[in-house]
From Swiss-Prot:
The keyword Signal applies. This is Microfibrillar-associated protein 3-like. The modification Phosphoserine is found at residues 298, 303, 306-307. Disulfide bonds join 68-125. Keywords: Cell membrane, Cytoplasm, Disulfide bond, Glycoprotein, Immunoglobulin domain, Membrane, Nucleus, Phosphoprotein, Signal, Transmembrane, Transmembrane helix. Residues 356-373 have a biased composition (Low complexity). Residues 170-409 are cytoplasmic. PANTHER family: MICROFIBRIL-ASSOCIATED GLYCOPROTEIN 3, MICROFIBRILLAR-ASSOCIATED PROTEIN 3-LIKE. Residues 29-148 are extracellular. Residues 325-340 have a biased composition (Basic and acidic residues).
């Protein structure tokens, strides 16, 4: 009995490990099946863009390589389109010859050989598989490097520069010639015609004063000086602007100056006022200024006040009536005419000044401007001829009366 029990205990243990091994194998199989099923889901994916390129710049005549930069599983199928939407294909005969202009490489690469300026534009890559489709666009820019155009532009610039330089040199030469001619003409004008006109103006300026007193002589000198200064200014102005038409302008200006200076004024008549208590005869009511006291009759005249825009001068004329004694009357008849000294000296004005003059019956003062005068008809009887060559103060002698004119500015 004891031997049989020991044998049974030995035979039972081998069955337990077998069961454990079978169960382990079954578990491993199930785990393997589940793992394989999960792997099948992970391996499939839609296409994605892994890098984007905006544009590519290449020189004309070189090659351009454009990458689609797309990834997906299973493998993607790539197609390229140009800017007008045309599908780019590589012909079979071109493949046999080593490839044409458009070469489709693995991984979605497009190789453009011998790029021309007309190849510029946008290129679109379309990548697709069983899970989806995606596209990527790249712009191709071509640099134009033709040597003929560069030479053409250079030649055009050189020709334009040469023309401009020739025109500038010609203009400078013409200006220089005009300057010389203008200077010569101006010098000739002021040596001949201009000098004569200026000399006439100076002579007329010396005869500007119509009365002889210290103040009038000073006014004449000032006016003469201003006339000379104005003439010099005109000459300097003519020399400062070197243009040929200036010669005519200068002559016109000088002629206008002479015309302004040569304004002729009609005779000025003054009415004598009879002193109180005396009655003057009708024939002596009006006195006329002698021709010697009038302004010059020169065609160039004797005043430049209008050209200098000076204020009008006030002239006060004093008329004194003195009765003449019989003795003086006899002397006057024997002598014939009065002798009048030169008015440029100050002695006559001192002799007939109001301070040293004898008291007269009445003195009437009339103020007249050099521009506004009231002409009065002259009587039939004028002054003696001897007074036509005299200057202020003017002396008029009647039968029994001596009238002295004194003028002051």
């Amino acid at each position: 009995m004891g031997l049989q029990k020991s044998h049974l205990t030995v035979c039972l243990p081998p069955s337990v490990p077998f069961l454990i091994l079978v169960s382990t194998l079954a578990t491993a199989k199930s785990v393997t099946n589940s793992t394989l099923n999960g792997t099948d889901v992970v391996l499939g994916s839609v296409p994605v863009i892994i890098a984007r390129t905006d544009h590519i710049i290449v020189k004309e005549g070189s090659s351009a390589l454009i990458n689609c930069s797309a990834y997906g599983f299973p493998d993607l199928e790539f197609k390229w389109y140009n800017s007008v939407g045309k599908l780019l294909k590589e012909m079979d005969d071109e493949k046999e010859k080593g490839g044409g202009k458009w070469q489709m490489l693995d991984g979605g690469l497009l190789n453009i050989t011998k790029v021309s300026f007309s190849d510029r534009g946008k290129y679109t890559c379309v990548a697709s598989n069983i899970y989806g489709t995606i596209n990527n666009t790249v712009t191709l820019r071509v640099i134009f490097t033709s040597g003929d155009m560069g030479v053409y532009y250079m030649v055009v610039c050189l020709v334009a520069f040469t023309i401009v330089m020739i025109l500038n040199i010609t203009r400078l030469c013409m200006m220089s010639s005009h300057l010389k001619k203008t200077e010569k003409a101006i010098n000739e004008f002021f040596r001949t015609e201009g000098a004569e006109k200026l000399q006439k103006a100076f002579e007329i300026a010396k005869r500007i004063p119509i009365i002889t007193s210290a103040k009038t002589l000073e006014l004449a000198k000032v006016t003469q000086f201003k006339t000379m200064e104005f003439a010099r200014y005109i000459e300097e102005l003519a020399r400062s602007v070197p243009l040929p038409p200036l010669i005519m302008n200068c002559r016109t200006i000088m002629e206008e100056i002479m015309e302004v200076v040569g304004l002729e004024e009609q005779g000025q008549n003054f009415v004598r006022h009879t002193p109180e208590g005396q009655e003057a005869p009708d024939r002596d009511e009006v006195y006329t200024i002698p021709n010697s006291l009038k302004r010059s009759e020169s065609p160039t005249a004797d005043s430049d006040a209008s050209s200098l825009h000076e204020q009008p001068q006030q002239i006060a004329i004093k008329v004194s009536v003195h009765p003449q004694s019989k003795r003086d009357h006899v002397d006057d008849q024997e002598g014939g005419h009065f002798e009048v000294k030169d008015e440029e000296e100050t002695e006559p004005s001192e002799e007939h000044s109001p301070e040293t003059a004898e008291p007269s019956t009445d003195i009437t003062t009339t103020e007249l401007t050099s521009e506004e005068t009231s002409p009065v008809e002259a009587p039939e009887r004028g002054l003696p001829p001897a007074h036509l060559e005299t200057t202020e103060p003017a002396v008029t002698c009647d039968r029994n009366t001596c009238i002295i004119y004194e003028s002051h500015v």
